[in-house]
């Protein structure tokens, strides 16, 4: 018997990223119900002209997510150039893999999967006078830029994609959920949770609140608890971390009944 036999997991990642987690759930014996609650749109190249010009002379370039790697490198290859002497950093192994898949090998990656872990790296302590470009989505967290500026760095952003709430019809999902057919919800950001709640509307609010929710970071888990989700489980980062959290939770849940 596989660990997720008989379980259906709601996968809310953007459509172009949902397949990996859905496949992992399937391989563990479960069923993935894919309902993207976050959309990703590239920023127009003309809007990135200033950032691309600054990037060419940067000392440090930080990619904060797989989307930053995908859309950032696409924009750079279309209209810009990577700095010859720059050092490259990636938040989390998923971002490093996304960079490597597009030919940018050797990005420095912390053991942890968040900005705090990256900022703890020895290479980012003495950055006074360094030119830093943070490649991210529009409106990301200020922690990284604030911290690096406090350390004396000259920080600029290259905001290469926007997060959106995708149009979606929740009727099929709601019908399945009402019939007891959704056993767990996975989210990768607080924004995804808010979008999901908006898409489900009032009919889905009690279903969402009562279903175990798995989040790959304590900050996301805290946001879910404040939102009113009754059972929130924090997992390690990435798809592998979410899967481990799902497997361990349902294994313990099943074991407690025997």
Predicted regions span which residues?
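Signature of uroporphyrinogen-III synthase
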Residues: 1-258
